[in-house]
From Swiss-Prot:
ATP binds at G473, D474, P475, G476, I477, G478, K479, T480. It comes from the Eukaryota. Required for meiotic DNA recombination in females. Probably not involved in DNA repair and recombination in somatic cells. It comes from Drosophila melanogaster. Residues 36-76, 796-818 are annotated as: Disordered. This is DNA replication licensing factor REC. The lineage of its organism: Eukaryota, Metazoa, Ecdysozoa, Arthropoda, Hexapoda. Signal peptide: none annotated.
Length: 885
């Protein structure tokens, strides 16, 4: 028993507080943070009135108070939350959902049965602003039954909400004029209002359906499932905010709505957790919901109703809508923007983590281009379990509220962009201007640049049809610069450098990353899927991943073998690659496969193959002047100069003026060339000279990469050209002549088929896109024929006059038939015999000659064929004699 107070009211040493020997006062419950003792009672909330005030909340009386405690109205009540605001820095922006609620009493009003699903603390007041807005949104949903399927929304648990429809409703605009601003600045509260209105409409629709039908009652013979309660419904807003750049997102705009566009580079493993658990009091039958965190599952220790004194026997409700099992997934989105140009060697596009919940989980796949709308949040880097970062810094992330596939969403161009595109198209030779603007530091090589430009424009089906280009040449010729320039101006590009060895090889296919190897990471082939372009520098050094590349080009998918499972991902990229010769310098006397380390099957997948050689020519003086001007800063990539006037273009193709074709505006049926009946392959048409910059023209005002990127994106998006009758006849004549030129070799002619015909058509359509033309003319086909002819000529041996080609010339010289191989082998053998002065050769010597002739497999069968044909005579064991002519 404590002694009584002494006279005068002086505190005794036995009394708590700052008395004699008692030390500093500490409450019964406290905790520490950063070395400071924080009382569990906390401070009075800013919105809490003084004791005795009219608006002061009433504190329910405690059932049992510990001895010596006198809880007043000013102290923290039973359901009051902790306030640690004094620990926050001065510039702290309180999040909208920062008020943590540990438990709630499910006391929904009669008008809204799902009120506590969306508003945990706010009480319903009839006639206030929130109630009026909810009723107005309900009326909007009921006025548009053709837009909202209430039965499907109840089953799915979410509904798409288009901004165009709800913003244009006049009745809703009168009640809620600031809807657009509220959903942008206060998205959580606004989306909760929109979702609660839909929840109420769905509940009323379900009640109407139950009243109209005869309710079945369970019997001992037949059990009838009870009608489940409607769970929480989520609104998925679309087009409420414009798409913004990830780099422009500021931390000061936390808890506001953002929209970004990009490619899904990483997909994490979904995690499941119980976030809320509903209980029912066994005495008063009141429903209580408690927040669940971690592995420990708390239970109510007292009833939320002040009249009830129950402290135990709370029954968990598994089927209650307030019992929520939350699904969470983290993905990483890489930015896709036409206003940014990245140098893949030194910088990478901006990335942002996105948190998916509920129905949005597993809604995307790696490599998919999406538009994500979400709420900006902050998190500690140390809390990220998908990566190994252990920093104390804060990074922004998006809490997604809606996700859409960006393949069907067109890109928007400003008025300034459209004016620049018109200026480029108004040039009399826009093809030449665009070709010269690609890698201007590389002098010459106009045809390889033109081939890369057509590959970036794609064919008719730009999402599924690819145009693959391979550049082979001596080191230092400028192949890497061309590839880097193509990666910068590609609308959807990925760059892989083979100089990094195994690290680059792992960037091709789909791999697992993260600390626990639970994050699915998209490779370059997946990031360039869907009409994108993957540039591979030194593809011959990626020997370990050439099988992955071949499979992607052939089957248009990337496989991922797993333990006990097998996964495949669709991938349709266009590949622009380069390779160096094995011996350091390209040998024109050897086949293409003997110069580079690429398999024949992979080589056949390239439609265009060009050999870039450093030969002495009359251009060397111009090359010297070009290099000097480049280092002096004279050839800088400037924007379109003032001389680009908005003038009408005289022709749809830059070749029509030089070919004496009637100007645009006349009937297309009258466009006929005087040599239509002659062979197209025999016409004297030098495309390389037409794309070359002449000395009298001076320096061109080259286009910047960002403008080329927008021009190519506009052409791919808005134009889908078709072949007219003249262009179709030109393609057919060239294809028949290409097939007829290989009639002497049956094996080669059998490889010229529909694939090569489709390649010519897709290249012609890409050439028409470059002129912003909706019709493919014969002049467009002529440019494509010039590119194909040059590719076939460069990749064939100088000694052979026949065009040995496969898919558009890509496998030229690499897949010759047995008869062609036999002719080349016998020709080299006779030359070797004449040089040595003898006709007897051993088998190893003949094999070496066959290797020089490009015969890598089946040499024994070839020697046997020569023996049976009488070209070689067997003179003993592994000894053969060359029969002279």
């Amino acid at each position: 028993m404590n002694p009584t107070l002494s006279r005068g009211g002086a505190p005794s040493r036995f009394v708590r507080g700052r008395g004699r020997g008692g030390g500093a006062y500490r409450p019964y419950f406290y905790f520490r943070r950063n070395g400071r003792v924080i009382p569990a009672g906390g401070n009075r909330q800013p919105n809490q009135g003084e004791p005795g005030a009219p608006d002061a909340p009433s504190v329910p009386p405690a059932t049992r108070q510990p001895r010596g405690w006198s809880r007043t109205a000013g102290k923290r009540g039973r359901n009051a939350h902790l306030d640690c605001s004094f620990l926050r820095p001065e510039n702290y922006a309180a999040p909208e959902d920062g008020l943590q609620v540990q438990s709630i009493a499910v006391d929904n009003p009669r008008a809204y049965s799902g009120w506590r699903l969306y508003f945990l603390r706010e009480k319903y007041e009839e006639g206030n602003e929130l109630a009026t807005r909810i009723m107005a949104v309900e009326a909007y949903y009921q006025r548009n039954p053709h837009t909202f399927d209430f039965v499907m929304i109840r089953d799915r648990g979410f509904f798409p909400l288009c901004a165009a429809g709800i913003k244009s409703d006049a009745q809703l605009k009168e009640v809620w004029p600031s809807l657009s601003e509220d959903i942008r600045e206060h998205p959580l509260r606004t989306l909760g209002t929109l979702s609660l209105a839909m929840h109420t409409v769905v509940v009323n629709h379900q009640l109407d359906c139950n009243d109209s039908t005869t309710a079945m009652v369970s019997t001992p013979e037949q059990y009838v499932l009870p009608t489940p309660r409607v769970r929480k419904i989520y609104a998925r807003p679309d087009d409420f905010v414009p798409v913004e750049s990830i780099e422009g997102i500021s931390h000061s705009r936390v808890d506001t709505l953002f929209s970004i566009r990009g490619f899904v580079s990483n997909v994490g493993e979904p995690s499941y957790s119980l976030t809320w658990q509903a209980f029912r009091c066994s005495r008063c039958q009141m429903e209580i919901a408690m927040r669940q965190r971690g592995t420990f599952q708390p239970r109510p220790y007292q009833c939320k109703r002040s009249e009830c004194v129950a402290r135990d026997e709370f029954v968990p409700l598994r089927s209650s809508p307030y019992t929520r099992l939350s699904i969470r997934q983290i993905i990483r989105v890489e930015e896709s923007s036409l206003n940014l140009v990245h140098d893949f060697e030194t910088s990478m596009p901006a990335e942002m983590d996105v948190e998916l919940r509920h129905d949005l989980v597993d809604a995307v796949r790696v490599g998919q281009e999406v538009v994500v709308t979400g709420i900006l949040k902050l998190q500690e880097l140390g809390d990220d379990t998908t990566t190994g970062d252990t920093s104390n810094q804060m990074q922004p992330y998006l809490k997604a509220v809606s996700i859409r596939d960006a393949s069907s969403i067109k890109r928007e161009f400003s008025e300034r962009d459209l004016e620049a595109i018109v200026m480029i198209n108004a040039e009399p030779n826009s093809f030449k201007l665009l070709v010269q603007s690609i890698a201007p530091e590389v002098y010459g090589h106009e045809l390889p640049k033109a081939a890369c430009l057509l590959s970036l424009l794609g064919g008719k089906g730009a999402e599924t049809e690819a145009i693959n280009v391979l550049l082979v040449g001596d080191p230092g010729i400028g192949k890497t610069k061309i590839l880097q320039s193509c990666a910068q101006i590609a609308e959807r590009g990925a760059h892989v450098s083979g100089k990094r060895g195994a690290q680059s090889a792992q960037q091709l296919g789909v791999t697992f990353a993260g600390r626990n190897k639970r994050v699915l990471q998209a490779g370059s082939l997946m990031m360039a899927s869907g009409g994108g372009h993957c540039t591979l520098d030194d593809v011959d050094k990626l020997a370990s991943k050439q099988a992955v590349l071949l499979q992607c080009l052939q089957s248009e998918e990337v496989n991922l073998p797993l333990a006990g499972a097998f996964a495949s991902f669709p991938a349709q990229p266009s590949v622009i690659a380069c390779a160096n010769p094995q011996r350091g310098q390209y040998d024109e006397g050897r086949y293409l496969l003997q110069n580079i380390n690429i398999s024949p099957s992979l080589l056949r997948e390239f439609h265009l193959v060009y050999i870039l050689l450093d030969k002495p020519s009359e251009r060397d003086m111009s090359l010297t002047a070009h290099v000097r001007a480049l280092h002096a800063g004279a050839r800088k990539r400037a924007r379109i100069a003032a001389r680009y006037a908005l003038k009408p273009k005289m022709s749809d193709s830059m070749c029509e003026v030089s070919l004496n074709v009637p100007a645009a505006g006349k009937d297309d049926d009258t466009i006929k060339t005087e040599d239509d009946n002659d062979s197209i392959m025999q016409q004297d048409y030098d495309l390389d000279k037409r794309l070359e910059v002449l000395p009298e023209e001076g320096d061109l005002d080259l286009l910047p990469p960002i403008l080329i990127k927008k021009f190519l994106s506009y052409a791919r998006q808005e134009l889908n050209p078709v072949l007219n009758e003249d262009a179709s006849n030109a393609v057919l004549r060239y294809f028949l002549e290409l097939k007829g030129s290989c009639n002497l070799d049956e094996d080669v002619s059998s490889q010229i088929g529909a694939g090569q015909l489709l390649a010519i058509i897709h290249l012609s359509q890409a050439r028409a896109r470059l002129d912003l033309s909706h019709v493919v003319s014969p002049q467009h086909v002529r440019d494509v024929i010039a590119l194909l002819t040059e590719s076939i000529t460069q990749t064939s041996l100088k000694e052979g006059s026949s065009r040995q080609g496969t898919r558009g010339g890509g496998g030229a010289g690499g897949g010759a038939g047995k008869s062609a191989q036999l002719r080349n082998f016998l020709e080299l053998t006779k030359r070797r015999s004449a040089a040595l002065g003898r006709r007897i050769f051993e088998f190893d010597e003949l094999k070496e000659i066959g290797t020089r002739a490009g015969i890598l497999t089946g040499f024994s069968q070839l020697v046997e064929m020569a023996n049976l044909g009488g070209y070689l005579l067997m003179k003993g064991a592994n000894m053969y004699e060359v029969v002279p002519d």
